[in-house]
Amino acid sequence: LVHVYVGKMTPAEDPFVDLARSAIRHYLATGEVVDPPSMSGDPPPSGVFVSLHEPAEPGQVEGKLRGCIGTVRPREPSVRREIARSAVSAAVSDPRFPPLQPGEVDQLE
């Protein structure tokens, strides 16, 4: 679904990937950006980029880009909020793509 990496974790191991996916689902259902609480062990506020990709075709490393938004410097008080906001923006505000629809979320990598 998204490429949000901290350290050397794979997307399946990274709790921030789940956060991004949940933030997108929440926004598509409610129209509101979730405000996730900071957690012990979180990195300090920082810029993040969230990339959404369609499923990869056989022989491809990754699928076609479906949305990508991010910041170089933090705009939010926590990295979790930065990820949530960037994930939602990638899903519905990337001017290169139509807004993501609820049925598409589970299909993204």
At which residue positions do the language-model features occur?
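Basic nucleic-acid-binding interfaces
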Residues: 2-109
